[in-house]
Amino acid sequence: YTSGGVANRVYEISTPYLTAELFDIKFAQSADVMYITHPNHEVEKLSRTGHTSWTLADVDFTDGPYLDNNITTTTLNPGSHTVGTGVAVVASATTGINGGSGFLATDVGRLIRFRDGYMKVTARADTTNITVEIIEDLGSATASADFALGSFSDTTGHPTCVTFFEQRLVFAGTTDQPQTLFFSKSGDYENMNENRGGTIADDDAIIYTIASNQVNAIRFMTATRTLIVGTAGGEFTVSGGGTDVAITPTNILIKKQS
């Protein structure tokens, strides 16, 4: 609120959005930070640190979210397991990767959970060969079928909407998972770690897909005493099952309202 609320000057910042995309942008704001979603773009974070100090950057999510774990015999074989860049990863087949298409150019920037750690795709040579940055030690550099591909990517689409609820940042509605909600860890908005394979804690991230008779993409979310989720086919409420019961990975209730 500078200059008595009079707009004596306009501050401009470059964005990745096209004019035709503006009406599909959704956002959630907490103080001087705003998270912005559009299905064609990575989640952006607009931060203000001063009247003329604003930054817009891709959100660098911690460990997730991910699609379901691989259930095929396809393995990934990394050239190293320790944290670092420029690591080659070879897939034994394309089965189980992008519906059998193997790695795609649109997978660059995508996270992959592998064994005990995770990595980010930095380059793609062909359908079975990629280069990655290992962000968390993988535990072993031997081939394994224990992997899961990231949910947010140019291949699968990015979230359609976003809101804050019960100290979590909530995203919803990617192209490939139009009825799915993605809750961050409690109090850690950019951490999407579900603690797969470990002991689940109440504050862990949550992925939940609304079950319905037909696919109805999530269009909006509104946080009240419950989380109201609007889809193309009706509205749902999301809660922990009671007025004062918090949502946890093992305690989440979704009810259709209309």
Summary of predicted features, one role per range:
Residues 1-5, 36, 41-43, 51-53, ...:
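Non-transmembrane elongated oligomeric "stalk/shaft" segments that connect baseplates/barrels to distal
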Residues 23-27, 56, 251-255:
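Generic structural motif
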Residues 8-12, 48, 53-147:
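Autoprocessing Asn-cyclization modules and mimics
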Residues 17, 148-168, 173-258:
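Beta-propeller and closely related beta-pinwheel folds
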